[in-house]
Amino acid sequence: MTFEMLYSKIHRVTITDANLNYVGSITIDEDLAKLAKLREGMKVEIVDVNNGERFSTYVILGKKRGEICVNGAAARKVAIGDVVIILAYASMNEDEINAHKPCIVLVDEKNEILEK
């Protein structure tokens, strides 16, 4: 049996842009994404702390430092300046669960890394 477990999280990151006309996804600063063990194309859940919206999308790696841009239709679910939590999950069996520790990245209001 497998269970869906928290794999990684970027906690309280700030939305820097929302691009309705892009083809979907969330663009995440590449350094921040790698620190959180997120891969391009990986499914993530976004939780907007400001308005309570929750939605799923996939990761695109961004080049700009601190960039967090929600793209496509999901851009209607956030506003620039909103604080969100980016969550990734993984399927794990009992042995993997016992050995796993989620990767949690904390950032400040400018999306600068505070701690991992």
Curated annotation (Swiss-Prot):
Its EC number is 4.1.1.11. The modification Pyruvic acid (Ser) is found at residue 25. Keywords: Autocatalytic cleavage, Cytoplasm, Decarboxylase, Lyase, Pantothenate biosynthesis, Pyruvate, Schiff base, Zymogen. Pathway: Cofactor biosynthesis; (R)-pantothenate biosynthesis; beta-alanine from L-aspartate: step 1/1. It is found in: Cytoplasm. Coiled coil: none annotated. One of its GO terms (biological process) is pantothenate biosynthetic process. Is synthesized initially as an inactive proenzyme, which is activated by self-cleavage at a specific serine bond to produce a beta-subunit with a hydroxyl group at its C-terminus and an alpha-subunit with a pyruvoyl group at its N-terminus. One of its GO terms (cellular component) is cytosol. It catalyses: L-aspartate + H(+) = beta-alanine + CO2. Pfam families: Asp_decarbox. Substrate binds at residues 57, 72-74. GO terms for molecular function: aspartate 1-decarboxylase activity. Its cofactor is pyruvate. Disulfide bonds: none annotated. Binds 1 pyruvoyl group covalently per subunit. The active site is at residues 25, 58. Catalyzes the pyruvoyl-dependent decarboxylation of aspartate to produce beta-alanine. Belongs to the PanD family. Heterooctamer of four alpha and four beta subunits. This is Aspartate 1-decarboxylase. It comes from Helicobacter pylori (strain Shi470). The gene is panD.
